[in-house]
Amino acid sequence: PIPNYMQGEPFLGLKKTSPRKFIYGHRDRVDEVRDLARSVRDQNFLYIRNYMPHLGYNQPTVWPDLGEIRHEFYRLTHEKMMNTSQWHFAGPTRPIEELYDCRSDPKNLDNLAKSKDYKKILSKMRKELTKHLQETRDLGFLPEFAAWKLFEGSSGWDIGKSKRIDLGAIRDAASDVGNANDKTLLANLESKNELVRYWGAIGFTAQKKKLSKHAKLALDNALGDSSPSVRIEVANALARHGTIKPALFTLIKELSHPNLIVVTHAARTIELLGKKAKAAVPAMEA
């Protein structure tokens, strides 16, 4: 007999069940590359929700970068020799939402998320993904350091079932990245919930316009946040918007944190800042 706690269903043999209407996907950290995306697909359409749209698909990674192919991608990108579809993969950012007709566009090259003709389908797939995230109590929206603290003496399974944390509020703050105005992002950054503050900081990192004076002041103050995950993302936001010295000071300090999750988070942030973070090289090499 199949144990009650197993969620899988037979798809072959005498006891096979009805086919699923939807399948779900996720994209999270791999090695040093941090990311967060979720997806849902039915027989016709694939919907992808990118919660870190300021990060491209083709992020630098130590192991793949040892080969020649990635460097060819970098060269073609630098020389602006990519077509639109290639740039979607190789470029520095991603759309917040992606929608593809998998039957007519099996390579997923034509993003329909902004097409008026597909508004109903987009809404349907968006709702289905939200429903799935709620039902599964998806913990992927927690920064890793906070997750490890929460899991001490327990497990992710137990935390999710217990409803000890407000996953809805955290997920809402993540959904604000790339979407919300300053008022909403500031409210997130100044929340009593450190997990919401984390996403508030990322929201300012992803913001394309120049920081307002109010936002910059709030971020300056947040460099002293009690959470290292928040401090790192606040420093990232400030550095990306031109306030380098205090941001690097904070990031370099986190390289000495006793928790290696924090250290790798800070190191990756410094790496992606590129030449802006040149002053941090000695600390990275130490």
Would you name each region that the model predicts?
Residues 30-114, 120-121, 149:
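C-terminal, low-complexity/hydrophilic appendages and adjacent surface loops
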Residues 1-3, 15-19, 44, 49, ...:
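A generic secondary-structure signal for well-formed alpha-helical elements
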Residues 81-96, 102-104, 112-261, 268-278:
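Long, internal low-complexity/basic segments
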Residues 7-8, 52, 145:
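Proline- and acidic/polar-enriched loop/turn elements at helix boundaries
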Residues 4, 73-75, 212:
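Alpha-helix N-cap/helix-initiation sites
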Residues 14, 59, 152:
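Short Asp/Glu-rich motifs
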Residues 281-286:
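Leucine-rich solenoid repeat scaffolds
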Residues 1-42, 111, 118-127:
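Polar, surface-exposed loop/tail segments
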